[in-house]
Amino acid sequence: MANKREFSLEKTRNIGIMAHIDAGKTTTTERILYYTGKIHKIGETHEGDSQMDWMEEEKERGITITSAATTAQWKDHRINIIDTPGHVDFTIEVERSLRVLDGAVTVLDAQSGVEPQTENVWRQAENYGVPRIVFVNKMDKIGANFDFSVKSLHERLNANAIAVQMPIGAEDQFEGVIDLFDMVADVYDEDKLGAKWETIPVPDEYKEEAESRREEMIEEIAEVDDDIMEKFLGGEEISNEELKAALRRATLDLKAFPVFAGSAFKNKGVQMMLDGVVDYLPSPLDVKPYIAHDKEGNEVELLADDNKPFAALAFKIATDPFVGRLTFIRVYTGSLKSGSYVLNASKNQRERVGRLLQMHANSRTEIPEVFSGDIAGAIGLKDTTTGDSLTDPAHPLILESLDIPAPVIQVSVEPKSKADRDKMDVALQKLTEEDPTFRAETNPETGETLISGMGELHLDIMVERMKREFNVEATIGEPQVAYRETFTVPTQAQGKFVRQSGGKGQYGDVWIEFTPNEGKGYEFEDAIVGGVVPREYIPSVDAGLQEAMKNGVLAGYPLIDVKAKLYDGSYHEVDSSEAAFKVAASLALKNAASKAGAVILEPIMKVQVIAPEEYLGDVMGSITARRGQMEGMEDRAGAKVINAMVPLSEMFGYATTLRSSTQGRGTFTMVMDHYSPCPKSIQAEIIKKRGGNA
């Protein structure tokens, strides 16, 4: 079976390209595809013509939204690349890609170093144990500073970044890079789009600095590898092969992160970074075996082996204009031919894979079979959704699913006509299938459709997609914040439901202790002794509470972070039922509300604003006026970086305010940080607006 493989597992790399928005990630991916022979014309993101940014919305905005998977070849290796979005509204795409990658390239902007979204994606990569190399991009930009960028990796991410190159010049003097292993300089020919470069001895004016940086690099590698340290201290000669092998081991163990320099836009340094992908990032054989669970819940290690039973994870659903519903899969073990049946173990359903495709940003090649370690697109899977496990029908396994964050912002959408209503229903069903952080629901009282997501941009793009892909004309309401409610004071309450109406009555009686459970969500404890509430009714009490908590106690927002301990109650031999105990539990919650110090929680965003110093006063004033708490300030490349915590409700329309107050020179990013109680006056306003119970 294995002989049909085009590339061995050792020569396969599954990598992601991750970065802050505008660090040049898509351009970097473009160049990789250009040099590996996958595209013949280079597309520029800022001209709206990039091969990877294949959805119309991305072309218009010049940002990457969907992680398009694409395949390239470099030095007899196959590199599968997942392009991930750098905008925080699309964090689920990043999480989703990290689940299926073996390694990643983090792209930094040489002028800015580590930025807020870099921190986010770096943390997520740490979470999934993904080895990384770093590409310091935009070395040709004014203010580019390689050493500052390396330092920011150490200081802001606590990452052991080891520079394996030294740039030759910077800004408009950036000519190429010096390889600190081979001690040669790669100098680029300006006219040949960077496809041509010359390897020359290190120029005299750089020799001394390059020698000292090489020494520093060897010392840093020695610190993460005992064998090298021994030779280093003993003054022995250490070969480049030994150094590279040690750095590879340290990178795979997340003890080191090799750093490269270049300018993707000017086509410099990308090829050496590709060598780094091959030299330092893992093949599917180098990563820890993926852990799945069998039907009994036992752990099963999935080794990358074509001869084992098939197991794969569906990590993305896309609606492709040419082939319809496309499921991106990562194969962990075994192989699969097109036309075969698989078991969707998450839903316990058999599905047939019609065709298998190898994806290039928005074109595709049909392939007869996929093998372990491959990433491919499958057509024909009708019921499979993001995070589902696809396995050999004779060996069902569940691969752990994705951790999906709850949406923080909501808007109402009103179709313009009856025909639009029908189209909108279809559109929302497709879009929610594709993106688990996008939700659509109908308010049972008002009948209006509400969509919720990770931020204003996220919802804007979904509405645009409804219009463009499904021809839905709709009116969009004002954005609403996804508030939550919680209890702040421990309390006990009874919920008793008795109904007598001829024949069989209803009887349920519970005493529940409610305590605040900050940051831990809802927990239920059964503390019943002596059977005062029979075993079979206890799950109904839990279910009744969870159901009641969905609509809160103050203004109809979900109640979170509460521990409920069922400790007493009573039942009736004939009249008690699961339904009665469900109602009793919801009554206990209602009765507790007035004594439990119920409050409304609002989402607090971690906001970072970058603006020239002359606008500092305006920016800080504007943040304070929005109930923002300053968290600190730093200097960065001639600008001030302001960190603050600001309630989401105050951030609507901030982009416009910032643009006008800084004459378009200020930028900001925000990411959800935590929930915090609203000030009393704002809470009263929210309750009044929602017609709740103050």
Curated annotation (Swiss-Prot):
Domain tr-type G: 10-285
Function: Catalyzes the GTP-dependent ribosomal translocation step during translation elongation. During this step, the ribosome changes from the pre-translocational (PRE) to the post-translocational (POST) state as the newly formed A-site-bound peptidyl-tRNA and P-site-bound deacylated tRNA move to the P and E sites, respectively. Catalyzes the coordinated movement of the two tRNA molecules, the mRNA and conformational changes in the ribosome.
SMART domains reported for this sequence: EFG_C (SM00838), EFG_IV (SM00889)
Alphabetical GO biological process terms: ribosome disassembly
Molecular function terms, GO-annotated: GTP binding; GTPase activity; translation elongation factor activity
UniProt binding sites for GTP: 19-26, 83-87, 137-140
InterPro entries tied to this protein: EFG_II, EFG_III, EFG_III/V, EFG_IV, EFG_V, EFG_V-like, EFTu-like_2, G_TR_CS
Subcellular location per the Swiss-Prot or TrEMBL entry: Cytoplasm
Pfam families assigned to the protein according to its UniProt record, in alphabetical order: EFG_C, EFG_III, EFG_IV, GTP_EFTU, GTP_EFTU_D2
HAMAP family per the UniProt record, alphabetical: EF_G_EF_2_B
Entries under PROSITE patterns matching the protein: G_TR_1, G_TR_2
Signal peptide limits: none
Protein name, UniProt field: Elongation factor G
